[in-house]
């Protein structure tokens, strides 16, 4: 089936569905972070949020170092299960992986919500919470890898929509934090609301996924691509043909993607035997390794300081009043998530640098390492070793704006470029591999956050 015969995405329903699925994949992580005041209250042995809502989340009274541990234990299972998902995704049916993960996340969040009404000692509550974080993020890893694999077979616009949905999850979490601060409700009420909200979001994600087989546009890319006629012409872009010959992995007509333009005048290479089979993970890795490395470095920088360091920054105002209470939720969490979402959305309009700029992309990614010392030298009252150089609030706000936009844009850019660097039948593997490297970057950043916090 030629690309010109592809059906339209009526009412943008497929795009909306992937946007909501992207939202659902990051709701668990963001709502655990949003509920930090509740967790701090429980770990301090109190059910009242009156005192913990306005405190610094990483102050010396945080004996459990909750912020760092919840970040690390969210990313380690993501790394482990994404690795398994990258190599074993062909062994388990796609629908089982996606739907099963969504149902498991929903069940675990329901159990987490139930714990709000259960009295536990701080140590036991911390252990149960960390176990819940581990298992929820394990299923999130399988879910993300499977969905990115699907997106690898579709136009890059849908990858951008999915990533934008993930960015919106953080905005919801930040707004929930602000409403909780402004409402003055007790910790149990706010925590119950936190954990019911992602349950509703996961239910909506399940509905969206179940609706995809009933949408003609989704069937064309996700189902009918597997049953193309054997006489279908091969993709004939010169660079793809050269890459095919270089790696010795001939593409079969059954594996040709309907998303790319076909040249009716080009004949298949007669000397190349068409061998059915699944694409090699290592062949795909050789094609996308530089883009994957850039993705790792982007998230390493981001998670090494956010939120472990950035959440410690406070206003330098001599009489902060309410601004002191809302400074970090607005200037750290809300600003980051809004600008990160904006950065992810920019790739809907342009992709720069593109796949032909092999040196420029790594340079831009490496420049982000400058944000680590910049944030560490901001107004952090708990400084013991480093001086405070960037004392004014405007410095922190400017750094956060650039930090967040660059994170969102470079993440979305690398995820969109990777499928373009491989053959059509290798795109699903490329999507799964990029998800693994995404998790690797998150884990590296979460681990480094302990070191950078100790250096303060």
Swiss-Prot record:
Gene Ontology BP annotations: adenine transport; adenosine transport; cytidine transport; guanine transmembrane transport; hypoxanthine transport; inosine transport; neurotransmitter uptake; nucleobase transport
Additional free-text comment from the UniProt record: Transport activity is insensitive to nanomolar concentrations of the inhibitor nitrobenzylmercaptopurine riboside (NBMPR).
RNA-binding recorded as keyword: no
Entry GO CC: apical plasma membrane; basolateral plasma membrane; nuclear membrane; plasma membrane
Composition bias type Basic and acidic residues, residue spans: 263-275
Subcellular location: Apical cell membrane; Basolateral cell membrane; Nucleus membrane
Glycan attachment points: 56
Stretches that traverse the bilayer: 13-33, 69-89, 98-118, 123-143, 161-181, 192-212, 288-308, 323-343, 360-380, 396-416, 432-452
Top-level taxon of the source organism: Eukaryota
SS bond partners: none
Keywords assigned by UniProt, alphabetized: Cell membrane, Glycoprotein, Membrane, Nucleus, Phosphoprotein, Transmembrane, Transmembrane helix, Transport
Induction: By platelet derived growth factor (PDGF) and fibroblast growth factor (FGF).
GO function terms (MF aspect): adenine transmembrane transporter activity; cytidine transmembrane transporter activity; guanine transmembrane transporter activity; neurotransmitter transmembrane transporter activity; nucleobase transmembrane transporter activity; nucleoside transmembrane transporter activity; purine nucleoside transmembrane transporter activity; uracil transmembrane transporter activity
UniProt modified residues of type Phosphoserine: 252
Sequence similarity: Belongs to the SLC29A/ENT transporter (TC 2.A.57) family.
Reactions catalysed according to its record: inosine(in) = inosine(out); adenosine(in) = adenosine(out); uridine(out) = uridine(in); thymidine(in) = thymidine(out)
Protein name listed in UniProt: Equilibrative nucleoside transporter 2
Name of the gene: Slc29a2
